[in-house]
Amino acid sequence: MRKALVCGAGGFIGGHLIKKLKREGYWVRGVDIKMHEYAPTQADEFLLLDLREPHHCWRALSLGRGETFDEVYQLAADMGGMGFIHTAECEIMHNSALINIHMIDTAARMGVPRYFFSSSVCVYRDMEPGEPALTEADAVPANPDNEYGWEKLYAERMAQAYARHYPLQVRMARFENCYGPEGTWRGGREKAPAALCRKVAEAEAGSHIEVWGDGTAIRNFTYVDDMVEGIYRLTHSDLEGAVNLGGDEYVTVAELAQLVIAVSGKRLGIRYVEGPVGVRSRNFSKDRSRLLDWEARVPLREGIARTYSWVEAQVRQAQRG
């Protein structure tokens, strides 16, 4: 039986990835600093470890009897939504850098043959609406919009260096705004889709929700089931170097907010307020991800409807105490 280690197993994408690996017949060990908050883990074994510590990385990767994991999926990071990314720059760079430094080094030294690293399209520069799609090579010369992107770019380069000097196959995906049920929806670390779903679920009919910025920023969003399928296919492919992983459905933040309101069935207004908004526009080439025979299949409206239903249930449960 193939064995996989999922780092960041207590997080949103990590929890869904474990489900995918179990369906594929793996024995899975999950590792995180916390248990999953919204769903029981399906991992065969779950270890509470702090991967900023080198000896915890050794513990995570140790199977005994000279065995190594067939695959390691490194999704552990200190991250959150736009507000968190702009206010916790030091924590993000410090914590995530330590995790990535120690995990890739330990995996390489222990003879792990295949290693997946979760990067982000935050490695790219800001864009103007209407610009041609950015390819993976356009990340250099580098000019990320935030420190989260700089740390991801550094971690990519580090992983590639280890792949050159050890018998380690590295695969890297640049995630494009993953969303869906069973993810953080309150507390400041939530991403835009979950935050909007929460605001709409909490709002009284006839009132309004607040949205940061003027609503014109352009984004694309990728449903979590599509993302984990892309991760799995990329990890088992021959594609070296980073791969943009996301859908082709681009919307403004205003359109996203209106979509959430529409699926809720409520009559609500939108009030735009000052707040961190990130880059103005996004548009990424999908040429390399198409080599995986992969594309995002869940339409945005369907994915938002599923996500809103789940977030609304969480809001109602929290209100009941």
Predicted feature descriptions by range:
Residues 20, 49, 202-321:
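C-terminal substrate-binding subdomain of Rossmann-fold SDR/epimerase-dehydratase oxidoreductases
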Residues 4-24:
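N-terminal Rossmann NAD(P)H-binding glycine-rich loop of SDR-like oxidoreductase domains
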Residues 42-54:
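Rossmann-fold cofactor-recognition segment
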Residues 119-120, 156-184, 205, 210:
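Conserved beta-loop-beta element that borders a ligand/cofactor-binding pocket
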